[in-house]
Design a protein with these regions (language model features):
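Beta1-alpha1 glycine-rich phosphate/pyrophosphate-binding loop at the start
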Residues: 8-68, 157-158
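FAD-binding core/adjacent interface of flavoenzyme oxidoreductases
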Residues: 1-13, 71-157
C-alpha cells in the first residue's frame, strides 16, 4: 500500500472544541497552513451530545447549548477556509512531527512544523482499563448513555 505524503505547518489532532478553537486562534495569529484531523464523521466532539446550555458565555458572550457552541466554531473554521478531514484515525505522531493517519482513502503522512493534540476526553471500557470482571448486558458508560439520549433520541437499553 502506498502512503501519500504531504507537508503542513500545523496539524491539529481532534476536531472538538479545543481543536476548533486552536485552529481559529492560529488563523487569527496569521498562521494559514493548518489541518484539523477528526476521527468522527462530524466536527464538534463531545459538545454534539451536550444539549444543556451554559456554553459560550466567555467566548461568544451568550449562553449556548453544546451543539450550538460547537457550530459557532465549525462555522468559523468553514468561513476562514481552514481545511479539515473527518473519518480519519491518527495512528502515530513521531518525534519528528510526522502524523500518520488512515481513512477510507488509505494511509497519509503529514510532515508538520507543529502538532497540537486536542483529542479531548474519551471513556474507556473496564476491559480497556485492564480491570477484571464481567459487564452485564445493559450497563452503559455515561457517555454512551448520553449519546443514545441526546444524539439518537433513544432511551438506553430500549
Amino acid at each position: 500500500m502506498e502512503i501519500r505524503k504531504e507537508n503542513v505547518d500545523v496539524v491539529i489532532v481532534g476536531g472538538g472544541p479545543a481543536g476548533l478553537a486552536a485552529a481559529v486562534r492560529l488563523y487569527e495569529q496569521g498562521i494559514r497552513d493548518i489541518l484539523i484531523l477528526e476521527r468522527e464523521t462530524h466536527l464538534g466532539g463531545i459538545l454534539r451530545q451536550c444539549i444543556h446550555d451554559g456554553f459560550g458565555l466567555t467566548r461568544f458572550k451568550t449562553t449556548l447549548s453544546g451543539p450550538e457552541y460547537a457550530q459557532r466554531f465549525i462555522d468559523q473554521v468553514k468561513e476562514l477556509g481552514i481545511p479539515y478531514v473527518t473519518d480519519t484515525t491518527v495512528l502515530e505522531v513521531s518525534r519528528g512531527k510526522v502524523v500518520t493517519a488512515v481513512s477510507s482513502g488509505g494511509l497519509v503522512q503529514w510532515q508538520a512544523k507543529a502538532v497540537i493534540l486536542t483529542m479531548g476526553c474519551r471513556e474507556r471500557t473496564r476491559g480497556a482499563l485492564g480491570i477484571p470482571g464481567e459487564r452485564p448486558t445493559g450497563v452503559f458508560t455515561a457517555g454512551v448513555a448520553q449519546a443514545y439520549m441526546n444524539l439518537y433520541n433513544r432511551m438506553p437499553a430500549k
